[in-house]
Amino acid sequence: MTPKFDIDYVLANITEDDKIALLSGSDFWHTHAIPKFNVPPIRTTDGPNGIRGTKFFAGVPAACLPCGTALGATWDRDLLHQAGVLLGKECLAKGAHCWLGPTINMQRSPLGGRGFESFAEDPHLSGIMAKSIILGCESTGVISTVKHYVGNDQEHERRAVDVLVTPRALREIYLRPFQIVARDAHPGALMTSYNKINGKHVVENPAMLDIVRKDWHWDPLIMSDWLGTYTTIDSLNAGLDLEMPGPTRYRGKYIESAMQARLIKQSTISKRARKVLEFVERASRAPVSADETGRDFPEDRALNRTLCANSIVLLKNDGNLLPIPKTVKKIALIGSHVKTPAISGGGSASLEPYYAVSLYDAVVEALPDAEILYEAGAYAHRMLPVIDRMLSNAVIHFYNEPPEKERTLLATEPVVNTAFQLMDYNAPGLNRALFWATLIGEFTPDVSGLWDFGLTVFGTATLFIDDEMVIDNATRQTRGTAFFGKGTVQEVGQKQLTAGQTYKIRIEFGSANTSPMKAIGVVHFGGGAAHLGACLHMDPEQMVANAVRVAAEADYTIVCTGLNRDWESEGFDRPDMDLPPGIDALISSVLDVAADRTVIVNQSGTPVTMPWAHRARGIVQAWYGGNETGHGIADVLFGDVNPSGKLPLSWPADVRHNPTYLNNMSVGGRMLYGEDVYIGYRFYEKVGREVLFPFGHGLSYTTFHVSPEATVSPIVFSSDSPPTATVLVKNTGPMAGAQTLQLYIAAPNSATPRPVKELHGFTKVFLQSGEERSVSIHIDRYATSFWDEIEDMWKSEEGVYQVLIGTSSQEIVSRGEFRVEQTRYWRGV
């Protein structure tokens, strides 16, 4: 148990240097300690879908939960609370007091690189999901850090871009999830975003930080994103408590100089130090492990499997193709995702998982008597798959000198694969600013033939196989998108190899500062990184032909493909909505021979184009499903779980249909949020544009009936007695299942332009076959309100409001109405 300390006593007795030290991290993950006064260091940890601990490189394995959009697709408060509890327990096992999550930025564009981390395109759904997972996490004693406040909705030039957004859109869309969290969850910490809002970086923007503390009366610790502090004076005076990570770049001695010039008040330093101490005192109560450990328990696996299965959205099921009967004799599994599951996106979401269940293994388990045919059909990777199971006796040696000089070995680390990220790695005597490393290992291919090798690096790297240079990614480099946008493109080499023969692999690596490449708008964490991948060289046409052959002879075919961490990651945005090259052609070719018995399973965190959707009878959206990806998908495909997921974002047929199409990247250092409040379904409905699948859509293996008239009581809205909408819902189908009833509010007679309707409530109800239940959804004052830019306040406008209850944004099944008799204004939560 950490000894307690008295905040007032500490502040009254510590030195000025101690106060200043508290205002920045001590290293990559920890706050400063003051041992003399029993003030301990607090450990923070990523990420949005699992708890990595303190090491990007050679980290302790962890539970990997489904990605943010997957969790949002459950529309299930209770499940999100349980997910939060699991994340909290994982933090405790990693010795971490503070979880750097959840992410609640908005998916204004389907191309956003971190779109998979957030819950939804709708601010109400996003806020409620965030509230639930935060309350779960903080019930364990771990502090949650909701992020990124605000406007980090795309990755392009994220540190430099000026997001130009109207006050109304800012309040109604982008701040609203944070406001819900502030009102209902009160998490202990808030992380600022990298970007500017309307001309000034959020981290040093008093108007933005005052909204949190003055408008919402929420007083969390406010920390910067990593290397997201840009000034000393402005950030401190605006209200930034903690600069992360350490060692400091803008505080320390710079604060002393600013205080001497009376540009920062002594009272400001004391105020910020008090907030850090309040955070430390609260966080230190968490019963964290002394060491970083794992906790891979059966009940956690079961929960993760439930989360994955309940997130899966049945997009299309013509002729009840699904579920596939377990009596099937021969089934074809096609797609590179079948054996290599996409369990998470990239960037801060990256971690070393306890395990990952592939769809192939799950199908073998579910169908012990079936003949299973497998073909990759087409590769979905952007970078060649990392070498792991065919690698042995691999280590990395670290030096302060390059290979051509006499050098001293400083450290040796064992590795299990050929990818490493060294941003937070250190060793005694290592010069973090400039060092070199050599990875050596033994590679034993399982197939003879010509092998492709791909090497991507942040720094410099050269690949040797049996001392023959195969790839040079050091002398000439081309910028790519890997490693938070700092890496090179993948350089490819080839070598003829024999199955079963062992080859010596050697990578000569130079740290980040050995690279001549520089970039604007990306975060330079230092250290460097490399990714070596390999696979047997294949003829794309032959791969498709092999897939078509097995599909033609199988009773059922599952094509499982999509995106992965190569395509969706922190550090870059997608250039388009397309699936990887060759995937659409593969799917179309399979449908040519087996459309009546083929189901397409897509794994992605955000929408992809589906030019073949009209031909497919069955389409399943499986997101990034975490450790239990394969089990979760199989549970739905074979009917062990009745799908209940609903899309948390609209699915456009074409990226050009999206309202952000002309404004989704930094141009001249700024990005215009020209769609204003018309994000996602709000836009598509306002302009009457069809989508491939609407917001809130998701099918079931059973059917439901909802009473067509919603009872709304009281009929007159008042702040003392807000109305509730009640309907009867009945499971009229053959099996138990869940339906999510979505409450939308329309203000058809408003004098102010408003969306056709907006989500302001939902509930998920589980019913046995034949069961009927009365379901109520509460309506709060924000359901009738918009941000009045003239008055600079919320405005609840008098008039009649329609209550529309749907099973998606386009399937309205029940209606009612109420009225507001008097216009009201207010600020706050």
Curated annotation (Swiss-Prot):
Sugar attachment sites: 13, 304, 473, 602, 627, 664
PA14 domain span: 389-548
GO cellular component, one term: extracellular region
Active-site residues, as the UniProt record annotates them: 225
Biological pathway: Glycan metabolism; cellulose degradation
Protein location: Secreted
InterPro entries tied to this protein: Cellulose_deg_GH3, Fn3-like, Glyco_hydro_3_C, Glyco_hydro_3_C_sf, Glyco_hydro_3_N, Glyco_hydro_3_N_sf, Glycoside_hydrolase_SF, Ig-like_fold
Keywords: Carbohydrate metabolism, Cellulose degradation, Glycoprotein, Glycosidase, Hydrolase, Polysaccharide degradation, Secreted
Gene Ontology molecular functions: beta-glucosidase activity
Cysteine pairs bridged by disulfides in the record: none
UniProt catalytic activity: Hydrolysis of terminal, non-reducing beta-D-glucosyl residues with release of beta-D-glucose
One Pfam family matching this protein: Glyco_hydro_3_C
Keyword Hydrolase tagged: yes
GO biological process: cellulose catabolic process; glucan catabolic process
The EC number(s) this enzyme carries: 3.2.1.21
PROSITE patterns found in the cross-reference section: PA14
SMART domains: Fn3_like (SM01217), PA14 (SM00758)
Family, similarity comment: Belongs to the glycosyl hydrolase 3 family.
Protein role: Beta-glucosidases are one of a number of cellulolytic enzymes involved in the degradation of cellulosic biomass. Catalyzes the last step releasing glucose from the inhibitory cellobiose.
PANTHER family reported for this sequence: BETA-GLUCOSIDASE (PTHR42715), BETA-GLUCOSIDASE H-RELATED (PTHR42715:SF17)
Protein known as: Probable beta-glucosidase H
Organism: Aspergillus fumigatus (strain ATCC MYA-4609 / CBS 101355 / FGSC A1100 / Af293) (Neosartorya fumigata)
